[in-house]
Amino acid sequence: MNPNQKIITIGSLSLSLVVLNILLHIISITITVLVIPKNGNTGSCNETVIREYNETVRIEKITQWYNTNIIEYIEKPENDRFMNNTEPLCDAKGFAPFSKDNGIRIGSKGHVFVIREPFVSCSPTECRTFFLTQGSLVNDKHSNGTVKDRSPYRTLMSVEIGQSPNVYQARFEAVAWSATACHDGRKWMTIGVTGPDTKAVAVVHYGGVPTDVINSWAGDILRTQESSCTCIQGECYWVMTDGPANRQAQYRAFKARQGRIIGQTEISFNGGHIEECSCYPNEGKVECVCRDNWTGTNRPVLVISSDLSYRVGYLCAGLPSDTPRGEDGQFTGSCTNPMGNQGYGVKGFGFRQGNDVWMGRTISRTSRSGFEILKIRNGWVQNSKEQIKRQVVVDNSNWSGYSGSFTLPVELTRKNCLVPCFWVEMIRGRPEEKTIWTSSSSIVMCGVDHEIADWSWHDGAILPFDIDKM
């Protein structure tokens, strides 16, 4: 084959391959156009997806045209449904661990806030841990003196449940040294109390924006629950105290809708004392178990109806649940009057289960150490001492502190009842330990259909820290 023939042959083969390649592309395009419509598609694929970028949720509308994606960012639709929360409480046979933040252990080498008064509240899609920071970090010089309750540096912040109160994931909620927070199904409402003791102000936030205020009406440390408020069918309820901690004070229940106060009522409770109520929804009413800081070692009970009418008294059970307290055997109980003469006290909680009651208390009678929850038969309505269940959460060789209640809404659990849950604060540092600071972590438990073994989910931080040795 001469050179000219070789050139002609190679050229013919190349041209054939080019023609074949073009034919294959034409066949591919023809099949794509003919086949896709038969599958009910017009050649484009529209899809709306939700993507999370750190703590920001962005909704994207993605239009696919063959091999090309067109992405449009669209505004996140606002949930327009309020939570109902009129369901009864689920019956709990025991309480299983839900979360533990280990904030102080992590804080020895991590950027974790010095906190007190942590509590949990839930929306239809998540539960969050709220806490009052001291404007300082664990193991830092600014943590000195944080045993003090009220200062201009204290703020209410929150993280997703189970996270430590760290600077990277915490969300600012309000300036506050006393607080409450709850979700109505649409947005979070938070209430932060701050300012001087004689002229404190409570600022109501809704969806992160200040919407209303409550000024101190008695001029003596206006304060609120330090646990979740309660929303029922779009209306949210909470309790506030103004007045002495060791004598008769003044108490009010408030109701708000979308962050605007629409009602309040004075709670008449002569001879009784109400502080730091732990409240939850149950069958369309708000049931609260509170702290008597004046005389009673039994806990005040407040039941609030939607029209702000109320019933107030004491937890009937024949066992005391405040600290300090006397011997169980010497306590008789009362549904109407404070019993015992110990004074002081600690925030606590209880759950009504029909006529029975689950009530939490420290194991120690004299100090904030250990924690147990007891079920007392007929303890909501009678001076019963019949203890039918007991579960240890923190053993008596470890510190506890405040405790409080919240519920898991049916939107989260898909049940037809509200799951009762509680948290236990575990205070470390001053005044019981040799440190320059005071902070806490928490364990969270939720009601289940099974009995749960005793154990100690204590704080576990090894003290003192480096800052305490300087």
What residues fall within each predicted segment?
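Beta-propeller fold detector
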Residues: W65, R150-T155, V167-A174, D212-D220, ...
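Repeated scaffold domains used in trafficking and secretory/extracellular systems
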Residues: G110-F119, A170-C182, D220-T230, G271-C279, ...
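Alpha-helical transmembrane segments in eukaryotic/viral proteins
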Residues: I8-S16, N21-N39
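Beta-strand-rich domains and repeat architectures in extracellular enzymes and scaffolds
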Residues: K100-E126, F131-T133
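Short loop/turn segments immediately following beta-strands, especially the blade-tip
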Residues: Q258, P320, I376-V381
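Structural motif
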Residues: G135-L156, D197-V203, N246-A253, G296-V303, ...
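Short beta-strand elements that form the blades of beta-propeller/WD-repeat-like
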Residues: K61, I71, V112-F113, C127-T133, ...
